[in-house]
Swiss-Prot record:
Alphabetic keyword roster: Cytoplasm, Elongation factor, GTP-binding, Nucleotide-binding, Protein biosynthesis
Single GO molecular function: translation elongation factor activity
Binding site for GTP: 17-24, 81-85, 135-138
Keyword GTP-binding found: yes
Reported function: Catalyzes the GTP-dependent ribosomal translocation step during translation elongation. During this step, the ribosome changes from the pre-translocational (PRE) to the post-translocational (POST) state as the newly formed A-site-bound peptidyl-tRNA and P-site-bound deacylated tRNA move to the P and E sites, respectively. Catalyzes the coordinated movement of the two tRNA molecules, the mRNA and conformational changes in the ribosome.
CDD domains noted in UniProt: EF-G (cd01886), EFG_III (cd16262), EFG_mtEFG1_IV (cd01434), EFG_mtEFG_C (cd03713), EFG_mtEFG_II (cd04088)
Protein name as catalogued: Elongation factor G
InterPro entries: EFG_II, EFG_III, EFG_III/V, EFG_IV, EFG_V, EFG_V-like, EFTu-like_2, G_TR_CS
Localization (cell): Cytoplasm
């Protein structure tokens, strides 16, 4: 079967925003207008097509990125609906990695919110062109121009309006299209499916002309031909303007801004038109880069062509009753059911059992998938998030997806003996699906410890364990995931010599430890010369050091941002073995870490509190009492927004405290910012507690 939709008519987009800006509602409207659903699903009724997990329908939030395919004006659009809640950052990170473009939604009153900043930064990191949609224009206090200003100021981006609203709040009727200079009004009685194109209202004409001039001026800055016309006083044609705006958007010089209200069915069709007109097809983005698995210094590229060697990235896993579904984005070549593909991470080949196109939680079997498309594959047992799949004859390893480390952990134990084994299986399946969810066993207590990105994240995972895997568990109090690091360089040796009956054990290494850049993690350098430590014992030494990192020397927390150089050692012809060098590496590391001024690090959070003026003093005093630092304040609507950095340790239970101190009138959002050195008092308290004083 040949390709049905040419590559230039494909769009892979994500919908990204702060929680509650209306992402899922917007996607539901898109599915309705593109003819996929015959009834609009509502988030508040719990019937939204994209929110297909039970907890999503109960809580009215999107947890997993559901992928779906629809057609608009003969263009195939693959949409990934991403969660806006900070605890599910991993879902956003993995979606953006495989998208070509995105729609960023903004609340018409709040504008840029904390999670908007996070997802916007992730979009910048993966260089994803975006168009902006100011949603909820029917809301009291809606202010289109204020939102554009917050995009400019807080995101440092260049927004450019391609529409302006007609009316606002309850009187929001439609938009002025600044490209074609016409008014578009939606009819309520047709669920917004029909709209009329009219003359621009006289009272808006001047404003529309000023905004259009601004649009042409901004676009002309990046287009020589248009700049020349502009300076000559000529007006560009609609086609010229669209073409120049498309180029400027794909190059990320500008971000077109539209408006509407998805819930009231206004503005969705024009948003779809903009996706088609201004967001890139797989042909508009640079070829994907990777490395040669057999020689990591060789950089390779793959063009989005069907006749190129096959390459794809696995960006999401779902375990369901029918087996493991692996969502993949195909970058080059063609994949057919029954094909054998290579996973460079494992070095193993696997056979693709089935290929399915997903529509939220419904699926349609397909026989092949082409370059630039997204689908799910069944039968890939070894696939993990971020893995490359490629042709066995032309291997390539695409760059993996970076995920943040978990910041909070709780102990879980099964309620009954019978749940013990089931819990282990359930947790490993959940950890398979979610790279920011970690499971380990505490060496001292034997308890199972699960870690994640926040309280809601862990709560939902425990809930899924109960619903999907029928495992009842008791959950302990949440604990902060502290870390340890070092502040100066040191050297130490590890010597492991044991004589037991026949052959003995002999391992001897010398290492140099030094601080690594924050966020760089662990780095191992092999500086052995003259074979004083044979090649086959280098890897075991590194492994021993890596294992020792898991239990720091101060309070048993993982050590981060450390560089270890193996520079000397010795071996015994008969008694040396891998195990002896692994133990020697671990001993040397512990010894060196003790001498390298180890310190305790704690996660600090970026907190934003929206509070009425009269409660400002209370909130600021409370933040200071939690060891917080106020970073800035600004006016928004009738409230003040306070931005602060506060240690996570001090934020447990904040939701109840803030409610009671402001009679429920303040709200806050919080997300992980970074790790910072803990003050001495806190360090002593934690170290003392962990050493059982």
């Amino acid at each position: 079967m040949a390709r049905q939709v040419p590559l230039n008519r494909c769009r892979n987009i994500g919908i990204m925003a702060h929680i509650d800006a209306g992402k899922t509602t917007t996607t539901e409207r898109v599915l309705f207008y593109t003819g996929i659903t015959h009834r609009i699903g509502e988030v508040h009724e719990g019937t939204a097509t994209m929110d297909y997990m039970e907890q999503e329908q109960e809580r009215g939030i999107t947890i997993t990125s559901a992928a779906t395919t629809c057609m608009w004006n003969n263009i195939r659009i693959n949409i990934i609906d991403t969660p806006g809640h900070v605890d599910f950052t991993a879902e956003v990170e993995r979606s953006l990695r495989v998208l070509d473009g995105a729609v960023a939604l903004f609340d018409s009153v709040s504008g840029v919110q904390p999670q908007t900043e996070t997802v916007w930064r992730q979009g910048d990191k993966y260089r994803v062109p975006r168009i902006c949609f100011v949603n909820k224009m029917d809301k009291a206090g809606a202010d289109f121009e204020h939102v554009i200003e917050t995009i400019r100021k807080r995101l440092g981006a260049r927004p450019v309006a391609i529409q302006i609203p007609i009316g606002a709040e309850a009187n929001f009727k439609g938009v002025v299209d600044l490209i074609e200079m016409r008014a578009i009004l939606w009819h309520d009685e047709t669920m917004g499916a029909k709209y009329s194109v009219e003359e621009i209202p006289a009272d808006l004409m001047k404003k529309a002309e000023a905004f259009r001039m601004q649009l042409i001026e901004t676009v002309a800055e990046n287009d020589d031909e248009m700049l020349h016309k502009f300076l000559e006083g000529e007006t560009p044609t609609v086609e010229e303007l669209k073409k120049a705006l498309r180029k400027a958007t794909i190059d990320m010089h500008v971000f077109p801004v539209l408006c509407g209200t998805a819930f009231k069915n206004k503005g969705v069709q024009t948003l779809l038109d903009a996706v088609v007109d201004y967001l890139p097809s797989p042909l508009d983005v640079p070829p994907v880069e990777g490395i040669d698995p057999s020689d990591t210094s060789v950089v390779m590229t793959r063009e989005a062509k069907d006749d190129a060697p096959f390459s794809a990235l696995g960006f999401k896993l779902i375990n369901d009753p029918f087996g493991k579904l692996g969502f993949i984005r195909v970058y080059s070549g063609v994949l057919k059911t029954g094909d054998t593909v290579l996973n460079p991470r494992t070095g193993k080949t696997e056979r693709v059992g089935r290929l399915v196109k997903m529509h939220a939680n419904k699926r349609e079997d397909i026989t092949e998938i082409y370059a630039g498309d997204i689908c799910a594959a069944v039968g890939l047992k070894e696939l993990k998030t971020g893995d490359t799949l490629c042709a066995t004859t032309d291997p390539i390893a695409l760059s993996a997806i970076d995920f943040p480390e978990p910041v909070i952990s709780v102990a879980v134990e099964p309620k009954t003996k019978g749940d013990q084994e089931k819990m282990g299986i359930a947790l490993s399946k959940l950890a398979d699906e979610d790279p920011t969810f970690k499971v380990r066993t505490d060496e001292d207590s034997g308890q199972t410890i699960i870690s994640g990105m926040g309280e809601l994240h862990l709560e939902i995972l425990v809930d899924r364990m109960k619903r999907e895997h029928k495992v009842e568990a008791n959950v302990g109090e949440p604990k902060v995931a502290f870390r340890e690091t070092i502040r100066k360089a040191s050297e130490a040796e590890g010597k492991y010599i044991r004589q037991t009956g026949g052959s003995g054990n002999y391992g001897h290494v010398k290492i140099r430890l030094e601080p690594n850049e924050p966020g760089k993690g662990f780095e191992f350098i092999d500086a052995i010369k003259g074979g004083v430590v044979p090649r086959e014992y280098i890897k075991p030494t590194e492994q021993g050091i890596r294992e020792a990192l898991q239990n720091g020397v101060l309070a048993g927390y993982e050590m981060v941002d450390v560089k270890a150089t193996l520079f000397d050692g010795s071996y015994h012809d008969v008694d040396s073995n891998e195990m002896a060098f692994k133990i020697a590496g671990s001993m040397a590391f512990k010894e060196a870490a003790k001498k390298a001024s180890p310190v305790l690090l704690e996660p600090v959070m970026s907190v934003e509190v929206t509070v009425p003026e009269e409660h400002m003093g209370t909130i600021i005093g409370d933040i200071n009492s939690r060891r917080g630092r106020i970073e800035g304040m600004e006016h928004s609507g009738g409230s003040q927004v306070i931005r602060a950095i506060v240690p996570l340790k001090e934020m447990f239970g904040y939701v109840n405290d803030i409610r009671s101190s402001t009679q429920g009138r303040a709200s806050y959002t919080m997300q992980f910012a970074r790790y910072e050195e803990a003050p001495r008092m806190i360090s002593e308290e934690i170290i003392g507690r962990n050493q059982g004083k």
